[in-house]
């Protein structure tokens, strides 16, 4: 191997002479002159900017050190000269990283001698000959290019050197360069001199030194000619001196730094930063700049202060001054800006601050040690190394970031944001000009002129109100009156962003019309185009909201205007007008309380008045508009500013910062508190607290349901109309929307109403546990979470059979019905037999509050109600969703509520296939499929090889095909987490309106149930009182009717050929009990009022007719005089007396009945309906599984499962004997937590009627199953009870659902010694003549029988009570439960001219007649019914499933609740109705 020759001297003698030059053919230059090759040394001298930067003078504003302080000023310097000095200085600092014992750096800058020296202690350069290069190491690294100790990138170094130039560049650009070093390890001292730009060198001088001597010193004289300089100028010296201070700041207190023999007074990086801040503070008049410091670790030290409008940074990487920053500065700054952005936007969401905005307000100092740093050039002004290669992390602490946030930067940014916003908003400023072009503005002629202060701008709610205002303006003229219609509600500018405000055309128009200038302080209106703004809106809640938004708009930008007298006024119109019949006397009422007060003063006698409601300005005619403007003093109310409380009230209503205060404001609302519209002035605080609060309460009520019935007002209106219109027959949803608007005074959008109806009928998994309406059509599925429902024009609905059991008709008379526009509408709340808010859950977001209540198992709710009735403690309930096959487990609990984890189901089919068979609640199939398809691997490839969906609208069935590698990755991460098969819900945000209408937070479902229980029990007591009262009235009627008939038959009372008044007087004299009908209330004469109950027969109540004026005179004996002529028979008397005897017994029995018994009876009825739902759900699930098997069989998909996901743990066994009530309750439930039911079997029937049931019972009985297990192998239909062997009657008489049940049916319900006649669905159903009380006054009655008809009632002998009939076996058929059809051949329609010409015989008498008719028509009726298909056979009572008895035990989560961990409250938001 050849020995490598030593390096040659880098002087001109070493350069070989070129051969003789050959001349080029043209151009006067030889080829050699045109194309040259330079040595590296020549290249550096020829192109120095590549290595040391420019050698020309530059002027730049920089920090320099002079006169013992830091100064920022323009500096003229040569960057190349500064760089060669910096290279030697950085080398000295680098030695600290090599030798921690280094303790001093001495710098001398001698201007006179043009000499600079840098000496540092610590390990010197090894004084030893390099074995490969054959020269001493000091000469090698200082005198030969591309030599360095930093070439090994496998070794992480935190020094400045990297490329092998460094000190050699200083040598090259110096006339003299001296290197001296002492190597104590080798006891040698080294000195060598280079001259002529490293072109000449002396031989090294080696001498001995002590072991303790370790240092290195570089002395050089810059070649000033190459920098176009003659001496070291002051600016250059000041810049070099500042660089020495840099080194002192970077090295810290362990190294003493001297400059020209004087120690630098900087012992830490913090001291160094203070030099800058002290200098900056001299020019500040406000508080000194803050200095926030954090030494993150040994490699990172950060200081932060404030800057004004421009980002500043002072940073170092391994002692190198990165004057242009770099990735290390970005790394630190991004953490600070992200924190500040969040803090600013939290304080003012409209600030719209971005990271670069924050950066412009920061001054950041960074001192970092970074492994093997990389820069943009040899000048090393910018670090370019990626953050991941830094070799260390700089994660600023939260405490430090908070301190930065409190340093004033947030306030600075908020001020800057305000300034920017104002600047943007000023672009839309108005001006006092004579003419503005704004669409739909009817400008006043004098607006913007010298009389502008006298002009009034009327702002109306929409175009229709504008028409009224223009009609009224014709009275005043258009010189001083302008009109502008608002398009709906104005933007809440207090919470809007600048972009929203500037893009809002309405606000821009108002500023132009009024001549408003942004944020100007107005002491008067002289500079405006209008001197007064008058708000003219509807007298409803939305109208109040519009007023409030306009007030908020002015207060946000021009609060002083609200203090200008009479600037802001409102124009009010009557809500109700009462006109005296026959005269022109008109009374106007401007508030409902005022009207109610007048109505009460009439004492019910308002028949002489016509009442008209004015809900909107559009109701008033043009003539009325002129009338209003003719008397402006009566209709115009001035808003008055009293004190700062007015401003606080406005902020309370509209500021997001006042959320908690707004909650308290709404909580303290007292119903009935309202503005007195008779006062001429209104303070802003009164407006907010007495009028605007009504809108907020209405908004809240539309969003948060009632604890009592679980309904929002819109849903309650739907149910109110459903009871009237769709109890028996289905109707299009679109039609029902119209009826709800008509009959319940619904004033909002039809689309939201249709959505609410659809929502009440939905029954897919995750929607309702019990849907109150039936979904006859496509009402949405779990495929898209209900969004796939059909248009309201195409789908039908009707009342679900279970709804009337949940909301018994007997309670309707006890409810507090509302009245709007003189129309009787829905009650304040309905009174279900269990808290339906727990059954179907609730969700919503309103003013100040939101709510989320999960669904719970109705079986568990019923069981807990029974426990409360028995004086036992409730069993805690967990959320439950009908049809959901996954698990719901309590994962955390604390005082504020519990958190539950909802988990879907998956199975491992084989090594590469996962089957998902259930998703968490409210995770829909389509969304989930999109999620699966979006999953990617780390390299961007699809995670699954294929996603196969076998699910339908009711089921979940996905097969995920993936590689073995991805299967392993998914298993390691966890299938539940990877495939998002879990979600959480919480009970920490359960807000509801209580029975008094006050918003209240509930912590547990048991708390809701307990509060409901007390109220519901109170209403059962009221129901009993009402039933007893009605029965006693019926008893008196029976006695009076029998006595009346006998008196007529005996001639004691003569009715023919006499005046009614005389007969009434006879009856009064003979002591017959009067039952007058209620007189029509004052609302009966209201224009346009529609009340579907108007056609109902007036209520008859036992009263003293002399003492009340609210009843119709002469009507007190109509119940006798309106009896049919056929009733005047001895048989009828006997029948009435028999009914009376029964009634006496019934009254006595009812008085003995307890409210508890009534409730238990209703719960028993509910249990039966739930069993029908169980059966249907089981059948549906069986059909789903069969269909899925067929789909898989056709597609060839795998059916066998390798491994199944863990099932829900089975309930723990207990040796404790269950209580009797618990055993009974467990036997009711078809909603067991056991998911492995092989067979659903109905129990054997009791003895009942051997009738064939109608076909629809199959449908109704199987309406819905509530088992958590849907894997049912077989469904066995129930057998009917044995009953009387009788045939179907000739014609079943239709009963309107919105009538009360017949008295006999109600009595049977309360007669607990025998089976109820209706609620238990016995074989025999009592029949009554059906009377349609709808508005068209049409009566449906049974026509006479064609053959085998019964004899006239007068010729019949009274029959004793019928003996119990034997009941035959029942089979499930398809007739609706409770439906009594009427044969088409037997129906006749008869128009009645008066609502009072009905038969007035008692309910009991009609019942008795009906039974006789049924008995006499057995044979003929049977054949007739078979032909017509319109008759319905008796329905036997469905029995509970013969399932094993269950006992209630605590689940794992309940028994271990003491160990539950704390969790954070989860607040959910939701939607309107």
UniProtKB/Swiss-Prot annotation:
Residues 1453-1473 have a biased composition (Acidic residues). It catalyses: ATP-dependent breakage, passage and rejoining of double-stranded DNA. ATP binds at residues 91, 120, 148-150, 161-168, 378-380. Residues 455-569 form the Toprim domain. Residues 704-1163 form the Topo IIA-type catalytic domain. Changing residue 1213 to N: In strain: cv. Kas-1. The record marks 845 as: Important for DNA bending. Control of topological states of DNA by transient breakage and subsequent rejoining of DNA strands. Topoisomerase II makes double-strand breaks. This is DNA topoisomerase 2. The lineage of its organism: Eukaryota, Viridiplantae, Streptophyta, Embryophyta, Tracheophyta.
